[in-house]
Amino acid sequence: MVSVRLDPVTQQVISDPDHFVTKFIENIEQSHFTAAMEMVADDCEYDNVPITKVFGKEAIVNILSGFLASASKVEWLVHHQVASGDMQHGVVMNERTDRFEIDGRWVEFDIAGLFVISDGKIALWRDYFDKEAFTKALAKK
């Protein structure tokens, strides 16, 4: 039974789902993408609800790596976050604005995220957002 997990970057103990997802987001923001992926289950389901659903770390890396690589800065501003459960089985939901600085200009869009923690890893990551707003934000860059 997994009750704690170490942050792959700082090696700090993480004992609750809320802190775990917060550290996951911080790792992405700080360009610690490999460390963030260590926090994801090998068979994780990643669902960008209006676009596509993929399964497994490799597929998640394929979806995100190009987009993140094009950004000189990444900020995921969490406005609200709620969590329940523990590191064995927990759920975290957040409302956030994901921001990416691309070619000197910020591209941003609003997200509602759902993370299910199972056995100390993110087993399900689902992001809900407006596809049209996302497309328009990218077109303005």
Task: Write out the residue ranges for each language-model feature.
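Low-complexity, intrinsically disordered terminal/linker segments enriched in charged
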Residues: V2-R5, L124-K141
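Short, cysteine-centered beta-strand-loop-beta hairpins and adjacent loop/turn segments enriched
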Residues: R99-E108
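Short, low-complexity N-terminal intrinsically disordered segments enriched in polar/charged residues
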Residues: M1-D42, K140-K141
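Hydrophobic pocket/interface hotspot
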Residues: F24, A35-M37, C44, G56, ...
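A short hydrophobic beta-strand element
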Residues: Q88-D98
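A solvent-exposed, acidic/Ser-Thr-rich amphipathic alpha-helical stretch
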Residues: F33-G90
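Short, surface-exposed coil-to-beta transition loops
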Residues: W76-V78, V107-A112
